[in-house]
Design a protein with these regions (language model features):
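Basic, Lys/Arg-enriched alpha-helical interface segments
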Residues: 1-65, 72-79, 88-91
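Residues forming the ATP-binding cleft of Hanks-type serine/threonine protein kinase domains
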Residues: 84
Length: 91
C-alpha cells in the first residue's frame, strides 16, 4: 500500500481542476484509491517522463487529463505534483 503526499501547490491545482471538472470527481477518487493500492496496475497507464521531467511519472485520468508524481518504492510513497490537461502537466 502506497501513501499519497501532496503539497500546497498540488492542492490548489486539484481544487481548481475539481471546480472546472465536477463530472470527473468519481473517476479522480478511484484514481487516487488505485494509486494507493498499487500504482503499477496496467489500467492506470503509468509511464515515466523524459527531458526536463525525467524522474517524474504520469497516469491517465482520461485521454485528455493526466496526474504527475514521483514514486519512492522503497518508502511506498507517491508525491503528487500536478494535475491537468496534457499540455499543462508536460510543460
Amino acid at each position: 500500500m502506497f501513501e499519497l503526499e501532496s503539497n500546497s501547490l498540488f492542492e490548489r491545482r486539484l481544487e481548481r481542476f475539481s471546480r472546472r471538472h465536477p463530472e470527473l470527481q468519481r473517476r479522480l477518487s478511484r484514481l487516487f484509491r488505485d494509486l494507493e493500492e498499487d500504482p503499477f496496475q496496467p489500467h492506470l497507464r503509468l509511464h515515466g517522463l523524459s527531458g526536463h521531467l525525467e524522474g517524474v511519472s504520469a497516469v491517465w485520468l482520461t485521454y485528455q487529463y493526466r496526474v504527475t508524481f514521483t514514486i519512492d518504492v522503497g518508502q511506498n510513497l507517491i508525491k503528487l505534483l500536478n494535475i491537468g490537461n496534457h499540455d499543462e502537466v508536460y510543460r
